[in-house]
A protein has these predicted regions:
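OB-fold and OB-like single-stranded nucleic-acid-recognition modules
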Residues: 4-141
Length: 141
């Protein structure tokens, strides 16, 4: 009985330290949360009016190209009309491309898709950078 009390007395500070460390770490570490889908849902033809805004942009992929010879190894999904006359583009940079289970230029070509993200302008063409496949949802035509 006396030995048990000694062990309990010795273990109490260790248990208290573990509890305190757990509480501190629960405040420091927060799993990455997925932002809620934006309220703004538009077509590719409306995207130019919403530069800088977070939106869901929907349309049909008219052309799709993986260009490994360009710096950053981009994949371009072009909407409205084929490149170079596209009205909207989704760009997937090489560093993000490995996250897709199949080549995006093959998977999405001629598909109606919706992409979620912040609309930027690149050389006058609105675009969204897709970093993860979850940003792109295939739609039924």
């Amino acid at each position: 009985m006396k030995n048990l009390r000694k062990w309990i007395v010795r273990l109490m500070p260790v248990i208290a330290l573990i509890i305190v460390a757990g509480l501190i770490l629960s405040r420091v570490y927060r799993p990455e949360s997925t932002p809620a889908e934006p309220d703004l849902r538009i077509t590719v033809h409306e995207a130019a009016e919403h530069i800088g805004e977070r939106a869901v942009v929907c349309g049909i992929v008219e052309s799709a190209d993986f260009v490994p010879s360009v710096g950053g190894e981009p994949t371009f999904l072009n909407f409205g009309r084929p490149h170079p006359d596209q009205v909207f583009t989704v760009v997937i940079w090489g560093e993000d491309r490995a996250r897709w289970p199949a080549p995006p230029e093959e998977r999405y070509l001629t598909q109606r898709i919706c992409v979620t993200g912040t609309i930027q302008s690149h050389q006058g063409v609105p675009q969204i950078r897709a970093r993860v496949p979850q940003q792109i949802k295939a739609q039924q035509i």
